[in-house]
């Protein structure tokens, strides 16, 4: 089996990376950064996001697993003290693969080819200077005109991140859906929106069309992308899925409880 390792690059993560690399090679596995079958992320959820985008062109063959060197994450459930146990499980191929849905973001331009991105957590659209005015279309039909700071569109697995901070719902990651959440929308007697997050199933899509401003600051997970000359931004549940190597039960609602409810 071929493997690669993504480190957060702090001292502890780098030390664990070297240990993991040595142990796995001792078991006969091959270190291959170009075409791995399993990627070990050592750091936090942000580190795994970096690993996901690094290998987003290999999603049909690569599975991810995370070791957290900070707080327990939604993607990283192994502790540094469990490294040897994890290595042994990888060497024995003693794991199942679970798949979660992703978000496809297609940016259409007036005078250039479109750009397409995949997000594991979310994509956001914001104006760099002024109030952002966007027409929101659902399945080809005008739904509302939004005035505010922008929109966040999240995956189910990303619903516990920025989406939750905006008041969005938490969605179990096995559900193929996307969630559209307003960012500081203006609602008064003149300007009105639904004022609530919208959850769309896999066979639905959302289009944001700029009314005036055509230059935006976009994020796709941790990536920051400036977009100009924008005609429309189309959001779908992607055909691709992310694959995680699961070695033991990792109940989603338990993670939610530990992250947001339980006392230290």
From Swiss-Prot:
Compartmental location: Cytoplasm
Keyword Zinc tagged: no
GO cellular component terms listed in the entry, alphabetical order: cytoplasm
UniProt GO MF annotations: ATP binding; metal ion binding; NAD binding; NAD+ kinase activity
Cofactor: a divalent metal cation
Pfam families (UniProt xref): NAD_kinase, NAD_kinase_C
Residues annotated to bind NAD(+): 45-46, 50, 121-122, 147, 149, 184, 224
Keyword presence, Glycoprotein: no
Assigned protein family: Belongs to the NAD kinase family.
Designated name of the protein: NAD kinase
Organism of derivation: Lysinibacillus sphaericus (strain C3-41)
């Amino acid at each position: 089996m071929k493997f690669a390792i993504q480190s957060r690059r702090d001292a502890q993560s780098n030390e664990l990376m070297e240990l993991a690399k040595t142990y796995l090679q001792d078991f006969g596995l091959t270190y291959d950064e170009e075409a791995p079958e399993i990627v070990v992320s050592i750091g936090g959820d942000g580190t795994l996001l970096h690993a996901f985008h690094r290998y987003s062109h290999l999603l049909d063959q690569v599975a991810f697993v995370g070791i957290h060197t900070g707080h327990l994450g939604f993607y990283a459930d192994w502790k540094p003290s469990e490294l040897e146990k994890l290595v042994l499980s990888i060497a024995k191929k003693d794991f199942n693969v679970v798949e979660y849905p992703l978000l496809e973001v297609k940016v259409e331009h007036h005078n250039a080819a479109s750009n397409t991105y995949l997000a594991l957590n979310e994509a956001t659209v914001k104006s760099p200077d002024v109030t952002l005015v966007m027409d929101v279309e659902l399945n080809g039909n005008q739904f509302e005109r939004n005035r505010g700071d922008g929109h966040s569109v999240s995956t189910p697995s990303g619903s516990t991140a920025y989406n939750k901070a905006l008041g969005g719902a938490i969605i179990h990651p096995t559900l193929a859906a996307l969630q559209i959440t307003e960012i500081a929308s203006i609602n008064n007697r003149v300007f009105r929106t639904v004022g609530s997050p919208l959850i769309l199933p896999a066979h639905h899509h959302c289009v944001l069309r700029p009314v005036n401003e055509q230059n935006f600051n976009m994020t796709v997970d941790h990536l920051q992308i400036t977009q100009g000359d924008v005609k429309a931004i189309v959001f779908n549940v992607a055909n691709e899925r992310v694959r995680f190597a699961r070695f033991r039960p990792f109940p989603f609602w338990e993670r939610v409880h530990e992250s947001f409810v339980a006392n230290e």
